[in-house]
Amino acid sequence: MNQIRQAPAASASNATESKQEIRNYTMNFGPQHPAAHGVLRLILEMDGETVVRADPHIGLLHRGTEKLAESKPFNQSIGYMDRLDYVSMMCNEHAYVRAIETLIGIQAPERAQYIRTMFDEITRILNHLMWLGSNALDLGAMAVMLYAFREREELMDVYEAISGARMHAAYYRPGGVYRDLPDTMPKYKESRWHKGKALKRLNAAREGSMLDFLEHFTDTFPQRIDEYETLLTDNRIWKQRTVGVGVIEPDVAKAWGMTGVMLRGSGIAWDLRKKQPYAKYDAVDFDIPLGTCGDCYDRYLCRVAEMRESNRIIKQCVQWLKMNPGQVMVENCKVAPPKRESMKDDMEALIHHFKLFSEGYCVPAGETYSAVEAPKGEFGCYLISDGANKPFRVHLRAPGFAHLSSMDAVVRGYMLADVVAMIGTYDLVFGEVDR
C-alpha cells in the first residue's frame, strides 16, 4: 500500500519539474570593476557562462563639457578638451583648435604644424602603451604593464618639458602652439636610488635639446616594441584569449559608425591622416596597418603596428624641425598674445594682452566641423559661432561613444571571460564617452 500511495506523489513531482522555467541570470559588471576601464556599468544577462544580452549604462562621468565650453570665451575652453579623453590629450585639443582657426580664417605657421603632427603621434604612442599594458593586465599578463610604462614615462617627461603638465597640457592654441620646443630636457637628480654611474646612464639621452631626446627615443623604441611582441604576439595564452574573440565584420563596423583601429582592424582602410590630411600628415611617409579577421588579436596587431608608424612620423618631424627654425604662432595680436618684450614698451600690446585673456576674441559667425584621427578613432568638434566671443554651440564627436553602442551586438554568444577582452579592445575612456 505504501508503494501504491507513493506513486502519485512522484508523478506530481515530475509534473512540477516540467512546468519550471529556466531563467537567465543578471549580472552587474562594474562600475567598480577594475576591468571596466572607468565608470562603465554593464548589465549582463547570462545563460550559464554565455552572454545573452549586454546593456551598457553610461553617464557616471558626465560633466557637461559642451555646455561649459559655451559659457566661456573660445580660448578658455582648450583645457576642457584635455579632460575628455584624458589619455589622448593633445589630439582632443587639435580638433577644437582647428575648428576655431577655420572660422577665423587663419593657419598656424609651418613649424607649428610640424610640432602638432609630432605631438599627435607622441600622444598616439602614449595612448597605445596605456592600452597595451592595461589590456594585457586584464587578461592576466602582468609584466607587460611594467614594460609599457617604462617608455610611457619618457614621453610623459616630454609633455612636462613642453607644457609644464604631465597630462593636461593645453599646449595647442588657435594660430599655433604655446611656445617653441625647449633647448633642454629635465634630468634625474641624485638620490639614494640613483647616483654615480646609474645617474649618468639615466641622463645620457637628456644632455641635449628635446629634439635630441626624441631622436634618441625614435632610435631605441622599435627594439622596445619587439620586447612587447616577444611577450604577447606568439604567447599561447594571449592568442587563446584574443584570436576569434570579438569578431566585427566590416559591414557591422561601418553600420555602428566605428572609426580608428576598430574599423581598420576589420580590414577597412579609413584613416583621416591619409584620406583627409591635416597639419603636416601629407608631408610625412607612413602606412596604415589593417587587420584581416576583425577580432581582438587583429586589433592588438594593428595598435602595435601603429606605434611603429607613429615612431616613423616622429622621426621625420624631428629631422625637419632641426633643419627649419621659425615662428610657432601667428603674428596677430587679436588672436595670439604679444611678446613679453613688447608689452614693456608698447601700451597697445599690453591692452591686447589684457583683452585677450579677460574677454577673448570674437569669432566670425558660421559653423564648421573639424575632425582628427585620434588614437581611439575619429574625434570631431562641431562648432557654431554667432559672432560673439563665446561659442553658440559646441558638439564633440567621441569615438568611444559609437564603439560602446555596439557592445550588445558584439558580445552576444561569447563567454563572460571574453567580455573583459572585448571591453579592453574597445579602448574606452569615459571622459569622452560621457563628456
Curated annotation (Swiss-Prot):
Name of the encoding gene: nuoD
SUPFAM superfamilies in alphabetical order: HydB/Nqo4-like
One term under GO cellular component: plasma membrane
Catalytic activity: a quinone + NADH + 5 H(+)(in) = a quinol + NAD(+) + 4 H(+)(out)
Taxonomy, superkingdom: Bacteria
Localization per Swiss-Prot or TrEMBL: Cell inner membrane
Assembly, per entry: NDH-1 is composed of 14 different subunits. Subunits NuoB, C, D, E, F, and G constitute the peripheral sector of the complex.
Main subcellular location of this protein, as a coarse class: membrane
Record-linked PROSITE patterns: COMPLEX1_49K
One Pfam short name: Complex1_49kDa
Membrane among keywords: yes
GO molecular function terms listed in the Swiss-Prot or TrEMBL record: NAD binding; NADH:ubiquinone reductase (non-electrogenic) activity; quinone binding
Protein name: NADH-quinone oxidoreductase subunit D
InterPro entries given in the database record: NADH_Q_OxRdtase_suD, NADH_UbQ_OxRdtase_49kDa_CS, NDH1_su_D/H, NiFe-Hase_large
Lineage, top ranks: Bacteria, Pseudomonadati, Pseudomonadota, Gammaproteobacteria, Lysobacterales
Keywords on record: Cell inner membrane, Cell membrane, Membrane, NAD, Quinone, Translocase, Transport, Ubiquinone
UniProt family annotation: Belongs to the complex I 49 kDa subunit family.
Membrane topology category: Peripheral membrane protein
Task performed by this protein: NDH-1 shuttles electrons from NADH, via FMN and iron-sulfur (Fe-S) centers, to quinones in the respiratory chain. The immediate electron acceptor for the enzyme in this species is believed to be ubiquinone. Couples the redox reaction to proton translocation (for every two electrons transferred, four hydrogen ions are translocated across the cytoplasmic membrane), and thus conserves the redox energy in a proton gradient.
Keyword Metal-binding included in the entry's annotation: no
EC number: 7.1.1.-
